[in-house]
Amino acid sequence: MTTPMKIAITGVSGRMGRMLVDTIDTSDAVTLSAALERPGHDWIGRDLGLALGGTERGVLVSDDIDSALADSEAVIDFTSPAATIRFAQAAARVGAIHVIGTTGMTEQEIAQIDAQAAGAVIVRAGNMSLGVNLLVQLTKRVAAALDEDFDIEVIESHHNQKVDAPSGTALMLGEAAAEGRGVSLDAVSDRGRDGLTGARQKGDIGFVSVRGGDIVGEHDVLFAAQGERITLRHVASDRSVFARGALKAALWARHRAPGAYDMLDVLGLKDG
């Protein structure tokens, strides 16, 4: 029987950190080996189970990245761009798999992270769910099939605590639409309309971000032409879909060669 994979969780006090702990607890394939939080956090040094309001579980919350990863096969990371860069460097030092769900990164930050893939396995995705990654592929195919008479808009909705916009998933969808049309997203992206903007530019890919309440995540890709519209839609009602996807990515990466991968690789959806 395969030994359960030892997983470290970063940002363990946050929404996704807690969901990952709960999801690990329901799986026989993985086990929680380390719980990490930022230096100075109230949970540092406390038993994770007690910090979560339950019983002791024998895992102390730590801010010592190297020690935590030395006893882990993989680290799952839904934190901030700056923290993710540090985790990528630490994971590469010890050869741990790094599964990244952090969003809001610049191209320079992504390059810093991907540079660590020379000696480590990195799986990075703006969204870990099966449904969203299928939506990405569908978006690319529909965009390729339709001409510029169809305007493309990506509309995303999230809870009122989300700090980046557009969401990482929205950008994935925008990239897919641009790739389908054979253009660069940077050249056609329209992320802000206010005041007298003038008519919509033909070929642009627009983004709309909604923030409110406790919305987990909703994404629509609208293809609108004269007399007809097509909408591709995904709704996440529970963060467990992201946690399950992240664990699937870690298990998939267990015996992979060093390199930078994404969820399309994990799910076998990559073209070619």
Curated annotation (Swiss-Prot):
GO terms for molecular function: 4-hydroxy-tetrahydrodipicolinate reductase; NAD binding; NADP binding; oxidoreductase activity, acting on CH or CH2 groups, NAD or NADP as acceptor. Pathway: Amino-acid biosynthesis; L-lysine biosynthesis via DAP pathway; (S)-tetrahydrodipicolinate from L-aspartate: step 4/4. Its EC number is 1.17.1.8. It is found in: Cytoplasm. Keywords: Amino-acid biosynthesis, Cytoplasm, Diaminopimelate biosynthesis, Lysine biosynthesis, NAD, NADP, Oxidoreductase. (S)-2,3,4,5-tetrahydrodipicolinate binds at residues 159, 168-169. One of its GO terms (cellular component) is cytosol. HAMAP family: DapB (MF_00102). PANTHER family: 4-HYDROXY-TETRAHYDRODIPICOLINATE REDUCTASE 1, CHLOROPLASTIC-RELATED, DIHYDRODIPICOLINATE REDUCTASE. This is 4-hydroxy-tetrahydrodipicolinate reductase. It comes from Roseobacter denitrificans (strain ATCC 33942 / OCh 114). The gene is dapB.
